[in-house]
Amino acid sequence: MYLFEYKNSLGGKSMEKNNKELKLEKKYDLAWDSYSKEDLEAVFSLNERYIEFMSECKTERECITKSIEIAEKGGYINLKDIIKNKETLKAGDKVYAELMGKVLVMFLIGEESLENGMNILGAHVDSPRIDLKQNPLYEDSDISLFKTHYYGGVKKYQWVTTPLAIHGVVVKKDGTIVNIVIGEDDKDPVVGISDLLIHLSADQMAKTLAKGIDGESLNVCVGSMPLEDKDAKQK
């Protein structure tokens, strides 16, 4: 960045640019250079907790469930319990409320009235993923597959030929909720999206990165073993 200084001539007849240039620079120091040993330990400890959270929580509901668990360990109490017990909130109390398992609000009660305002810190759960369609199951070439549609800003080429996991919630007719997680344990079945072999993909390789894998091709292989009944017409 340069600052040029202009001055009026004494006679006011012309404007002259001062030849002197003032170069403005801002120096930035690496944060790593300022960290003590204790600071570094704290940084990596936080990173480990963050990785654990991201590895465990793949959907909005899972993030909210885990966040509530962390909040309760930090002293937060469910607002429903406060209301049920007809308790009164006071300054310093910590309460939370959740909505449909996908929204969480947490309050640290202050000393002044809400009429004087409140500090709000907001965030959203960003969960890029591939969702199953309403009736996803179909068969092709004796293989069972799920039709999908993607949610969020996913790079489609990153989702093929890599082990995937299924996370979801099933609500039975009687209202019972079943949480499903398949693929996170090493002993779980493996699901994934296939891709063309290198010697069959000349046309695909000629396409741009954005078009090499299209959304309609993101179908998940979920079964390839036939039924044990050898006489069954449909296996």
Language-model-detected regions and their locations in the chain:
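N-terminal hydrophobic/helix-forming segments and targeting peptides
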Residues: 2, 7-235
